[in-house]
């Protein structure tokens, strides 16, 4: 497992602090042991027979130690403690100051980021408010223009010139199928009569075509089938009487005809009943 450099530095400093603290403890212990040995040596020298004889006159022998400030271990111990404290303070500052600075820098960056976001939000809100104001103003102007705008006036259209079309037959062109004859125009040769149109003057009946109502028979032309006799016209030989038509003068009665009714005048051309 690979540790980050920051954690490695912390562990290295902690190990050195433990080593220094252990070294100070060992040094203080050695100083205390040496001091005790020195005191015992001094006491033994004072209690030797020679010293006892020299001080025999004294009732008591007083053994007094040196003050603590005059002890040999006092200065190294105090110096070591101060040095350890200074080292701990220095190491703490060396480790803590970068951490505090990084944290402060991170807080400042976060604060700047929040301020930038707040500024962006303010700009966006200002743009939205400005856009809404412009839209409302444009809508109000459009509404006012719609109210003020007059109704469109009709555009005058100039009259179109009248075109006169000649629908009469063209010279050199055959008549078109289904084209009715024009009043006052001569009939075209070979043109058959049209149903529903009166016959043209001087137009002979066509073979296979039914005679037109009201058309008189033509001299030299045989009568057409189904053509009723005309008043004042001589009957045609071999023409049978028509139902609903009076018999023609000189026309013989036909077999199957009813006899004259009693009290009814005989029809012209019927012989008297025997």
UniProtKB/Swiss-Prot annotation:
Region annotation 7 X 6 AA repeats of P-G-M-A-P-R: where it falls in the sequence: 177-254
Residue spans of biased composition, Pro residues class: 151-161, 172-274
Segments traversing the membrane: 11-31, 80-100
Name this protein carries in UniProt: P30 adhesin
Biased composition (Low complexity): 128-141
Domain description: 13 hexapeptides with consensus sequence were found at the carboxy end between AA 177 and 267 in a proline-rich domain.
Key words of the record: Cell adhesion, Cell membrane, Cell projection, Cytadherence, Lipoprotein, Membrane, Repeat, Transmembrane, Transmembrane helix, Virulence
Region (Disordered) residue spans: 128-274
Described purpose of this protein according to its UniProt entry: Adhesin necessary for successful cytadherence and virulence.
Keyword Lipoprotein: yes
Region ranges (3 X 6 AA repeats of P-G-M-P-P-H): 183-236
GO BP terms: adhesion of symbiont to microvasculature; cell adhesion
A single GO cellular-component term on record: plasma membrane
Chain residue ranges for the region called 4 X 6 AA repeats of P-G-F-P-P-Q: 195-248
Membrane topology: Multi-pass membrane protein
Note: Spontaneous hemadsorption-negative mutants M6 and M7 exhibit a truncated P30 adhesin.
Keyword Amino-acid biosynthesis appears in the UniProt entry: no
Superkingdom to which the source organism belongs: Bacteria
Location in the cell: Cell projection, Attachment organelle membrane
Main location: membrane
Extent of the Sequence repeats: 177-182, 183-188, 189-194, 195-200, 201-206, 207-212, 213-218, 219-224, 225-230, 231-236, 237-242, 243-248, 249-254, 268-273
């Amino acid at each position: 497992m690979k540790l980050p450099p920051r954690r490695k530095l912390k562990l290295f400093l902690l190990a050195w602090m433990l080593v220094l603290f252990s070294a100070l403890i060992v040094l203080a212990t050695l100083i205390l042991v040496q001091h005790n040995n020195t005191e015992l040596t001094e006491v033994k020298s004072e209690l030797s027979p020679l010293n006892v004889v020299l001080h025999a006159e004294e009732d008591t022998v007083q053994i007094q130690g040196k003050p603590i400030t005059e002890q040999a271990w006092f200065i190294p111990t105090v110096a070591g403690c101060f040095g350890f404290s200074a080292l701990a303070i220095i190491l703490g500052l060396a480790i803590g100051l970068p951490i505090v600075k990084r944290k402060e820098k991170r807080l400042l960056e976060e604060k700047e980021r929040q301020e930038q976001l707040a500024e962006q939000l303010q700009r966006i809100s200002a743009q939205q408010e400005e856009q809404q104001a412009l839209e409302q103003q444009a809508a109000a102007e459009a509404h006012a223009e719609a109210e003020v705008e007059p109704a469109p006036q009709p555009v005058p259209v100039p009259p179109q010139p009248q075109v006169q079309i000649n629908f009469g037959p063209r010279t050199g062109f055959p008549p078109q199928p289904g084209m009715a004859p024009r009043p006052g125009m001569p009939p075209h040769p070979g043109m058959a009569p049209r149903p529903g149109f009166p016959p043209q003057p001087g137009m002979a009946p066509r073979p296979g075509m039914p005679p037109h109502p009201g058309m008189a028979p033509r001299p030299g032309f045989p009568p057409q089938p189904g053509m009723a006799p005309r008043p004042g016209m001589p009957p045609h030989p071999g023409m049978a009487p028509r139902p609903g038509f009076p018999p023609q003068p000189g026309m013989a009665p036909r077999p199957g005809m009813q006899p004259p009714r009693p009290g009814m005048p005989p029809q012209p051309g019927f012989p008297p009943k025997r």
